[in-house]
Amino acid sequence: QPDSALLDAELTKGLPAHVTAATGIDAMVHAIEAYTSVHKKNPVSDMLAKEGLRLLSSNLMAAVNEGHNLEARSNMLLGALYAGQAFANAPVAAVHALAYPLGGHFHIPHGLSNSLVLPHVMRFNAADKQAAAQYAELAPYIMGADFSETSAGISDEEVTNTLIAWLEQRIKETGLPMRLRECDIPEDAVPMLASEALLQQRLL
């Protein structure tokens, strides 16, 4: 095990835009799933998740579109660190459970796998009122200034729906694929992917 990790943004300046986008969304998923985890959720992981999301969400597009923007790159690294510390204390869940077989069978990069299923898992989870309330709590950290313009006086469910739509739009703006078929995954593979996701009992 390493004794330390150095977050040097200079080393990430050459990272391609699509890799920056996928790894950035992956880090956001770490924080979102840690905050909404039914296993070991705690005040420390919550704090780390929220601050990680604030940094990641507010710097993702700058890092994607301006690869040499060291401030954005540095903030992405710090946000990813916080998100990693969050899910080290409160584990990830269904997004990752679904992402693993996508990578294992179709060699989809891990960050992209998470990005493909994130909105759909959130929409499914939001049928539960507690999950919707937790997503709503994260909305201002993810949406930033966009949150105050859209959220006044609406329910947790409506805030969550707005947040999911916001995330889908942001993923689209990064240029990442949005659908499984865009990654050449056939429809008849879906039952197998779902079955294998259910085997990830440590995450569900």
Question: Residues of each region from the PLM?
Answer:
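Carboxylate- and glycine-rich phosphate/diphosphate-binding segment that chelates Mg2+/Mn2+
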Residues: 1-90
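Short, well-structured alpha-helical segments that form the helix of a local strand-helix-strand
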Residues: 73-81, 160-164, 191
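Short, flexible active-site recognition loops that position polar ligands and cofactors
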Residues: 18, 40, 183, 200-204
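Short acidic alpha-helix initiation/capping motifs at coil-to-helix transition points
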Residues: 51-54, 92-93, 166-175, 193-197
